[in-house]
Amino acid sequence: MSKEKGKTQNKKRKLTRQEKKQIDALIRQAKGDGKPHTAQDSIPFERMYKDGICRLANGRYSKCIEFEDINYQLAQPDDKTAIFEALCDMYNSFDASISVQLSLISRHANKEDFKSSITIAPQNDDFDSIRAEYTEMLQTQLERGNNGLIKTKFLTFTIEAKDIKSARARLARIETDTLNHFKVIGAAARVLDGKQRLEVLHGLFHPDGERFNFAWEWLPVSGLSVKDFIAPSSFRFGDGRMFQMGGKFGAVSFLQIAAPELSDRMLADFMEAENGIVVNLHIQSIDHNEAIKTIKRKITDLDRMKIEEQKKAIRSGYDMDIIPSDLATYGGEAKNLLRDLQSRNERMFLLTLLVLNLADTKQKLDNEVFGAAAIAQKYNCILTRLDYRQEQGLMSSIPLGENLIHIQRGLTTSSTAVFVPFTVQELFQSGEALYYGLNALSNNMILCDRKKLKNPNGLILGTPGSGKSFSAKREITNAFLITADDIIICDPEAEYYPLVGRLKGQVIKVSQNSTQYINPMDINLNYSEGDTPIALKSDFI
């Protein structure tokens, strides 16, 4: 009896139809419908590792490098050519398995940080009025330029790998090669770790400069994911031509490259927008042999069409050399392209160029987009809104290495490298940095602490009347107000006397009629240990 009971208990009970329906419903709920339902769901990455590797969908992994600007626009033609050729070499080093994203971001900084960097704190002495006046001057100069904006540049490369271990090894090799290329160009570059990449994403999703607060040890305790620390309060993509991100309105457009010739000034003009802009270039290399085969097939097709047109001309009784002009143009361009790929170390790339504009209101957004479109029109290109694809456009405009907009234009290496990401190097240091005027190209403030340089010495050169003395007096005043440095002025013409008097300095007059004097014969017999002081003084005189 007990054995039969045990057999009955070991039998698996069949699920009822109702229970099966409940299980299927739970499975469907866990899988979801593939659509984002929260702001976090819209951000297209699965995991961010501490070392800076980001796992995307479909077994893809990316890493990000931040690089600084260099003085390209002010460089001599030979230097510009060298930078351009170095860019070409870097792009050629990426094979067809590597996707590259070049991100140029201009966004508003935290206002308090900028204010504190130029504000001279009062010290409750006789010079607080001068400090207040000098701070007011600095704030005026700050408003003249775009120092309220932070401009950062990133290069993100993406590969496919079966697991994180193999991805980490290959990404490390690509990282080393890319850093070497930036070193040749002359641009300082560094690899971002996971927290730094999250901070960049947070800055894009919170464009007003909100502070980023995050630590890896907070995740297990809070039960949150990294997306919870970077996501905005909301996304709204209901409108086909724009979107809302928190309290901001935004629009993503793509650049139709219709110009026969491209200029290296285009990206620089985009980045000069007053209210911030984000420009992204998604670059995908094509296998060299496949590119040559494809172009040869196109040339064959064009030749076949040309033969058909010639046959039609003979049948119609007119000159067979008269063929459609477009056919002749395309045939010549295809042959030139084939020659470049075969003999000029050129490769083929697929390029997607996206422009992201953000503003506080719809009207301001339309003005920003119109301004960006005017820049594109200046270079015979067309900036077109991504209708009903704003979400994909936004997520393709953050430096994750994910391109969800496959509107691509085929370009050679030289044509791709024409989009030079460099303009002019800015100098805006914190601490005891002194004001040295405005950048001649960007009109931004120059704040520099020369004591941090290898050689802090300096000369003020210029033609008569160009402001050399004024520059020296301004630097003296600035150093007096914010540092504890000793200031010594040798002034044969006595033009600094009023400044020294206002700053309550000591004036020593050395002349034939003055009571102060310097005795070159004065000697201290104890100042030298090994040599004879009298002999040294005699030799000096």
Residue ranges and their predicted role:
Residues 2-424:
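Extended, folded cores of ATP/NTP-driven motor/assembly subunits in large transport
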Residues 70, 77, 84-92, 179, ...:
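Glycine-rich phosphate-binding loop of nucleotide-binding enzymes
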Residues 71, 103-114, 128, 132-134, ...:
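Switch/coupling segment of Walker-type NTPase motor domains
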Residues 79, 403, 441, 515, ...:
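Short capping/connector residues at structural and topological boundaries
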Residues 81, 149, 172, 328, ...:
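Conserved structured core elements
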Residues 159-161, 285, 451-452, 493, ...:
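A broadly conserved detector of short glycine/acidic/proline-rich loop/turn motifs that flank catalytic sites
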Residues 164, 168, 324-327, 358, ...:
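Hydrophobic alpha-helical scaffolding
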Residues 389-439, 454-455, 463-466, 471, ...:
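Loop-rich catalytic cores of soluble enzymes, especially ATP-dependent carboxylate-amine ligases
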